[in-house]
Amino acid sequence: MNRHFYLLTLDIYGIKNIANPIHLDFYKKTIKRDFNPEKYKIKAIYGENGSGKTAIITAVKLLRNLLIDKNYLSDHETQKSLVEIINKKTRNGYIECEIYVDIDEDREILDYYISFEIKDDGRIYITEERLSRKNGNYSKNSYLCVFESKDGALEKFGNDKVYEFVKEKTLNLLDKQSFASSILTMMNDFPHDKDLNNDFVTVIELFAFAISLNVCIDNADIHTNNRLYQKIQSIEENKKDSFTKETFNQLKREILEASGRDILVPKNLYSSYEEQIAKLSMFIQIFKPELVNIEVDKKDFDQFYKCNLKMIYENYTLDQEFESRGIKKMMDLFYYLEDACMGMITFIDELDSNINDVYLD
């Protein structure tokens, strides 16, 4: 299956210093049948210090987390950091985006909106969420609502039977978790006599879009590792052998953002990981020619190898953890650039701060 996503527009309000709504167009032309996202892949957001560039990246990361992690707003430490992220004056905000979706040349345009606010108990709650779609070949068509929720209650989704089933399953939950993250947990329980129809598929497309989002930002989520190890433990307990490369890449990126540097590599993907590290070594040698190689120190860990990288120089070996901050940032940057080359939507905050001017001459 060939799956491609392209971010058309992004609207943000109430994140960090964004106290007034802002709108970003990543493609200003009318979408036509011959639209080719490959020609419009690289965009730059620039402005003065304090103009809101990092706030935009933060909003994208928040959007991704809300869509893929149904427990995101339940975490106490996450709530504490989110309260600091929401604009102090507005105490509420929203994110809205238009997404071009092409799956095996079946094209759609999705419009997703989610709003949130700090309530009297000092916690962040989702106040409204909706998803609409229209034909991707004819962008002037009107949007059709896929689902909508307000104040924690589902107001529309699918036909009457599907709606009643899903509404009961999500009762009093949708102010604490997004509908997209909630519906995936129902897949095994969904009655076979219920018609899932295109609405369900469209929500899955939205979830897939969220997985394709890749955000490189300095203020790492220090609580990510705990959630990831819980996910891995769940995989082990359920004896799921279908641990895909896509899933692994997602976990790997998030672990790299967290405090630890060791990563868990599924044994069936270890050869691919070695190839990736060989490319990483060549990339770092551009900036640090004295590096001879990067080797993987692996330890057996059930279905995984626990891997740590060793930086090999002519007269000494250095654990990755003790490499210079600049080189570690370049190593992280490599993974994000590689994912961008693989078609993922990648946001990199302060890209110029990662690369010294001497390398750009």
Task: Locate the predicted segments by residue.
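Hydrophobic positions in the central parallel beta-sheet of the AAA+
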Residues: 10, 346-348
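Pre-Walker A-like glycine/lysine-rich segment at the N-terminus of P-loop NTPase domains
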Residues: 2-62
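Electropositive, glycine-dotted interaction segments
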Residues: 113-286
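Conserved ABC ATPase signature
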Residues: 41-50, 301-338, 348-357
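Short acidic, glycine-rich loop/turn motifs
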Residues: 14, 97-105, 133, 311-315
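Extended helical coiled-coil dimerization/tether regions that scaffold
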Residues: 3, 13, 249-321
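Conserved catalytic network of the ASCE P-loop NTPase/AAA+ motor domain
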Residues: 38, 88-89, 336-340
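Conserved P-loop NTP-binding catalytic core
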Residues: 58-119
